[in-house]
Amino acid sequence: MTAQQLDASGRLRHLLTLEGLPRETLLQLLDRAGQIRDAAVGRVGNKRQVLAGSAVCTLFFEPSTRTRSSFQLAAQRLGADVLNFDASTSSTRKGETACDTLRNLEAMGVRGFVVRHPDDGAVAALAEAAGEGTALINAGDGRSAHPTQGLLDMLTLRQAKGPDFSKMKVVIVGDVKHSRVARTDLHALRTLGVGEIRVCGPQSLLPDDETLKGCVVGDDFDAMLEGVDALMMLRLQRERMEEGLVPSLEQYHAQYGLTNERLARAGKDAAVLHPGPINRGVEVTDEVADGPQSWVLRQVANGVAVRMAVLETLLG
């Protein structure tokens, strides 16, 4: 898939996954996003019109609030016209395929597509069907990838703990097995050379494939917290309880919920990240979510800057 994302000169053509992308490409995107964020270009009233005259479509086949809104703001602040496609009210309900939808919108002059889909590989399949000069961005597909979330998480880590990823110890906590965010972050952490990657969660929620290769893996949260610089807490999907993978929300919180008492075991000023939406009282307490070590809202703010950087790189 790496070759599919890059053109013959090595320039990014689509952003489908972080897996296999060169370290230099990730750092270039992070550097550009950092410049945008530092200059406060991502704020209302301070726009860069590099995409004026271009059209971007958010093509979402799954519900989303933060990701869709973030991409919409990013595109608008670069001067693009934005179309919001809603599968529930579109011609796909009449039998039109996603590829036909893409081609029809291309014919109208849309150059950029931000796609979320419930199926693994669906965005890559659309990229294969896209015409020359059209760019696709994966806004989350199945369990496999959510590249802009991974980039904004890496930008937040760099802001919180400095530019030297090799000195960081990071723990990912929760339902790694079903999480596209976790898989994406693991690819990014490895590519950027993070010193130690720990993964913690119930055995029923940890993958048994190559996903965790090279990671320190365990189910004792208190032990895994010792000396970490950052914690990446994952959302527990309620359906996991219905599937019997988690006995109860209360028991999950007792074993894997982040409290101030547990946070004290981590390294000094350890940063707390969460992709949202947060289940308060399950993954984290109110005190942690709203506390001084929470970087959650800064992740959200960084998301706009990251998505501006990606859109600018692909379409600018």
Swiss-Prot record:
Keywords: Pyrimidine biosynthesis, Transferase. GO terms for biological process: 'de novo' pyrimidine nucleobase biosynthetic process; 'de novo' UMP biosynthetic process; amino acid metabolic process. Gene3D superfamilies: Aspartate/ornithine carbamoyltransferase. Pathway: Pyrimidine metabolism; UMP biosynthesis via de novo pathway; (S)-dihydroorotate from bicarbonate: step 2/3. InterPro entries: Asp/Orn_carbamoyltranf_P-bd (IPR006132), Asp/Orn_carbamoylTrfase (IPR006130), Asp/Orn_carbamoylTrfase_sf (IPR036901), Asp_carbamoyltransf (IPR002082), Asp_carbamoyltransf_Asp/Orn-bd (IPR006131). Carbamoyl phosphate binds at residues 66-67, 116, 146, 149, 276-277. One of its GO terms (cellular component) is cytosol. Its EC number is 2.1.3.2. It holds the Pfam family OTCace. GO terms for molecular function: amino acid binding; aspartate carbamoyltransferase activity. It catalyses: carbamoyl phosphate + L-aspartate = N-carbamoyl-L-aspartate + phosphate + H(+). The keyword Cytoplasm does not apply. It is an enzyme of class 2 (transferase). L-aspartate binds at residues 94, 180, 235. Catalyzes the condensation of carbamoyl phosphate and aspartate to form carbamoyl aspartate and inorganic phosphate, the committed step in the de novo pyrimidine nucleotide biosynthesis pathway. Heterododecamer (2C3:3R2) of six catalytic PyrB chains organized as two trimers (C3), and six regulatory PyrI chains organized as three dimers (R2). Belongs to the aspartate/ornithine carbamoyltransferase superfamily. ATCase family. This is Aspartate carbamoyltransferase catalytic subunit. It comes from Stenotrophomonas maltophilia (strain R551-3).
